[in-house]
UniProtKB/Swiss-Prot annotation:
This is UPF0522 protein B. The keyword Cell cycle does not apply. GO terms for molecular function: lipid binding. InterPro entries: Bactericidal_perm-incr_a/b_dom (IPR017943), BPI/LBP/Plunc (IPR032942), Lipid-bd_serum_glycop_C (IPR001124). Residues 1-19 form the signal peptide. GO terms for cellular component: extracellular region. It comes from the Eukaryota. Belongs to the UPF0522 family. It comes from Dictyostelium discoideum. It holds the Pfam family LBP_BPI_CETP_C. Glycans are attached at N148, N245, N333, N345, N370, N423, N432, N495.
């Protein structure tokens, strides 16, 4: 997108073809990234296997030392471990816990113990520390989840392994004929060290995976639009994670609810935040009824702030006669057929001179969405028409206020397995043109209206392309308009395996309906 697109409105006027988790837990916002329960089941299985593998690969070196006159040597550590019943839960604002309700392990090693009093006594054998059958041992990690305006940060801060007395058992098997040396204290110390290794290992494993988790919930950070001004456009990522409110599944569907407004970064490096605030609060049924892997929900606030950030800074703007293509049926000249038809006094008073058009910053429209279209209401732009004299003076001749209401239809396309684009088509445009003042007598506003109506078919709304999280490819893509929302749904295929773990049909329920508690 470039300055040509900003000229679109005035170009249309001249018929110029220009290339170009309880109800209320979901905050008002512009964007929501939802990950379904079914997808998370598959991901949790892979994540569980990953953590298990990391723990089983832990370095368990031989140990030796002296404790209260007892010399010990521990060698040949062997570990078996299994994690089951993955869970996550929200503990408070920005704080989650994830883990496994059941962990079983069996840690075995060989020992040799020596004590020297009158004579030196030694014994050897094996020690086994294991989870007792029928006892409950769990593993839980606390996560700090922060969505600030520019980034998402997920960090595992600590892991605990709580269990009751008797849940973890230590067994000593002495292989010598005489076994008299007490070693319980040393065994307890080694067992405690092992628990610390496991909990620290889980914390590290989760933090190593945190960037890919963050990307899943914030796949889009920047809007890929290029303007002549050099401005850049970022998404305000401030927000939170929200669990599905009434889910019987575990893990439940989870959504990153973010502000979703567009933040302008100008060439000076300054950031300009939206003046609008989000107002629409989605309903549970809108956010949680999708059965595909992934759902992006867009509200009117996102579109309003996008228009505001992209269009307003490019104004005021001036269009000169030289900018109009020679092939255009309408030229910025007082003697052209168009201007002599709508303003005869202009032509007689200033024959065959150029016309300059000044455009003021537009008033951004209100955006509403229904099941049929995206509706833009009260989009306004003021323009001044000036004649250019031989002395290069610009003399005001009349001013025009253009108001537009428009309906847009949106379709989701997959440009590749890693990229999708949102393509929009103008269904209708309703112009309202007012001549606010004139220094050349009567100006026929209907001439502008007719040109705009005839030009509807040539209006091309630029499509914007977005990447999916880099770890995945997409399939089963679908888009649908609902009550004040646009929803884009698709299934995800992990690139490393190129196999779908869970594949569900798309069945969106977008009715405006609150669930009963």
């Amino acid at each position: 997108m470039n300055k040509t697109i900003i000229l679109l409105l005035i170009s249309i006027i001249f018929e110029i073809v220009i290339s170009s988790s309880v109800d209320g837990n979901y905050p008002a916002g512009g964007l929501y990234f939802g990950v379904s329960s079914n997808f998370l089941v598959g991901e949790s299985e892979k994540f569980t296997q990953y953590v298990q593998d990391e723990l089983l690969a832990m370095d368990l070196p031989d140990q030796s030392g002296d404790s209260d006159g007892v010399q010990y040597s521990f060698t040949h550590f062997k570990l078996a471990l299994n994690l089951q019943d993955f869970f996550y839960a929200q503990l408070g604002p920005g704080v989650f816990q994830m883990g496994w309700d059941t962990i079983t392990f069996n840690l075995q090693w060989e020992y040799e113990i020596c004590v020297k009093k009158v004579v030196k006594l030694c014994e050897s054998g094996t020690i086994t520390v294991y989870t007792a059958s029928g006892q409950s041992v769990s593993l839980g990690t606390t996560l700090d989840v922060l969505f600030n305006s520019s980034n998402a940060k997920i960090e595992a801060t600590s892991t605990v392994m709580p269990f009751e007395a008797g849940a973890v058992v230590a067994s000593v098997h002495c292989t010598d004929s005489v076994c008299l040396i007490p070693i319980n204290d040393i065994v307890s110390e080694v067992s405690s060290q092992f628990v610390s290794q496991v909990t620290n290992g889980v914390t590290k494993a989760i933090n190593d995976k945190a960037p890919s988790i963050e990307q899943l919930f914030t796949p889009i950070k920047q809007i890929p639009i290029t303007m002549d001004s050099g401005n850049q456009y970022w998404i305000d990522l401030e927000g939170c994670l929200v669990e599905a409110n009434y889910s019987s599944n575990s893990p439940s569907t989870i959504t990153a609810a973010i502000n979703g407004g567009i933040v302008l970064e100008n060439t000076d490096g300054n950031f300009v935040y939206p003046t609008q605030t989000p107002s629409y609060v989605p309903y549970d049924s809108q956010m949680e009824s999708f059965t595909s892997d992934y759902c992006i929900t867009i509200t009117g606030y996102f579109i309003e702030t996008l228009l505001d950030a992209v269009l307003v800074p490019e104004f005021p703007m001036t269009i000169q006669p030289s900018q109009i293509p020679a092939s255009s049926p309408v030229q910025l000249n007082t003697s052209s057929d168009f201007f002599s038809g709508i303003a005869p006094n202009l032509t007689s008073k200033y024959p065959n001179v150029g016309i300059q058009v000044n455009l003021m910053p537009p008033t951004i429209p209100t955006v509403t969405i229904n099941s049929s279209a995206i509706i833009l209401t009260d989009f306004e732009i003021s323009t001044s028409f000036l004649v250019l004299t031989d002395n290069d003076d610009a003399i005001p001749v009349f001013n025009v206020l253009f108001k537009f209401d428009a309906e847009i239809q949106t379709t989701l396309y997959t440009d590749s397995v890693s990229v999708f684009s949102l393509n929009s088509t103008l269904l209708s445009i309703t112009p309202n043109v007012t001549i606010t003042d004139s220094n050349v007598g009567s100006v026929d506003a209907t001439g502008f209206v007719q040109l705009i109506e005839m030009a509807q078919s040539i209006i091309k709304i630029p499509s914007i392309t977005y990447p999916v999280p880099s770890k995945y490819s997409i399939t089963n893509v679908n888009s649908q308009l609902g009550d004040q929302i646009i929803q884009l749904t698709f299934d995800l295929i992990e690139n490393s395996t190129n196999q779908k773990y869970l594949k569900k049909s798309v069945n969106l329920n977008l009715k405006k309906k609150k669930k009963k508690k």
